[in-house]
Amino acid sequence: MSKIIFMGTPDFSAPILKALHEAHGVSLVITQPDKPVGRKRVLTPPPVKVMAESLGIEVYQPESMKSDEAFERVHALSPDLIVTAAFGQILPERVLDIPRLGCINVHASLLPKYRGGAPIHKAIINGEKYSGVTIMYMVKRLDAGDMIDSVQVPIEINDTVGTLHDKLSVAGTDLLLEVMPSVLSGTNNRTPQNDSEATFASNVSREEEYVTFDRTALEVHNHIRGLSPWPVAFANFDGKAMKLWASEIAEGSGAPGEIIQADKAGLVIATNDGAVRITSLQPAGKKRMDAASFVAGAKSQLVGMKFNEA
């Protein structure tokens, strides 16, 4: 049996690890260190570590794959193949050169589009009709290696990062299992990427989380769902940041950012060509709530108030 190292960290990667281990056996899992989570800063293991331990696989959590210790750990195992999926660290060339069959990555986009760390977010924000998963060889440049295979996944109008993430994780799992026999036998396809068609999906910045309403309703809706359920979009309301968790396209007109309707269905906010309805939100210092609860508890008239008012 081939020796396989799996590298991954978040929820996206855990089912991929499980399926890979059950089909081919994984000798070692490498994942990010445990991190403090929440207000109480509780040290929490990444989902891939939890999955690996439930499967009885040895886990290694280096601070950096660039360290001599990490190199030696991988080198000592003499793996035939490294499989990565949303690992969160760039592998140095000397690690990429270790496995006899190379290193392959399960990437959540249709490469060469959306290379980088936030392909799911950026595909939704940009209003793409399709996303997908590509399995490719890893090279020194980020997400630029030869492609083995890909699968297309439709993006529905109300998909969020969360729902699309789950669809792509399933698609990535299925595609990996499909290509593994040919990868292990060295008979798989290798298609070079066209660098002239490459686009990049860098991690979402704080500035990109800020929603403006002087755009089309569809652009605003895409922005909100493209950041939900993490890191969550926000806009300024009554002098404070309000997180906007969920939205839908609505009818109506008014000045961009103006609340034109507030009832049990939510807050309807005007855009430059129509409106969006906010159905779930989080006022500053409070927990997430449905917009109907916010409307019911409002101490002042909401209709006519504006988001992002200077």
Swiss-Prot record:
PROSITE patterns attached to this UniProt entry: GART (PS00373)
Enzyme class: transferase
InterPro entries: Fmt (IPR005794), Formyl_trans_C (IPR005793), Formyl_trans_C_sf (IPR037022), Formyl_transf_N (IPR002376), Formyl_transf_N_sf (IPR036477), Formyl_transferase-like_C_sf (IPR011034), GART_AS (IPR001555), Met-tRNA-FMT_C (IPR044135)
Single GO MF descriptor: methionyl-tRNA formyltransferase activity
SUPFAM superfamilies documented for this protein: FMT C-terminal domain-like, Formyltransferase
Keyword RNA-binding: no
Residue positions binding (6S)-5,6,7,8-tetrahydrofolate: S109, L110, L111, P112
A Pfam entry, by short name: Formyl_trans_C
Entry keyword set: Protein biosynthesis, Transferase
Superkingdom of this protein's organism: Bacteria
GO cellular component assignments: cytosol
Catalytic reaction equation(s): L-methionyl-tRNA(fMet) + (6R)-10-formyltetrahydrofolate = N-formyl-L-methionyl-tRNA(fMet) + (6S)-5,6,7,8-tetrahydrofolate + H(+)
Keyword rRNA-binding: no
Disulphide bonds in the chain: none
Enzyme Commission designation: 2.1.2.9
Role description: Attaches a formyl group to the free amino group of methionyl-tRNA(fMet). The formyl group appears to play a dual role in the initiator identity of N-formylmethionyl-tRNA by promoting its recognition by IF2 and preventing the misappropriation of this tRNA by the elongation apparatus.
Protein family: Belongs to the Fmt family.
UniProt protein name: Methionyl-tRNA formyltransferase
Organism: Macrococcus caseolyticus (strain JCSC5402) (Macrococcoides caseolyticum)
Lineage: Bacteria, Bacillati, Bacillota, Bacilli, Bacillales
Gene that encodes the chain: fmt
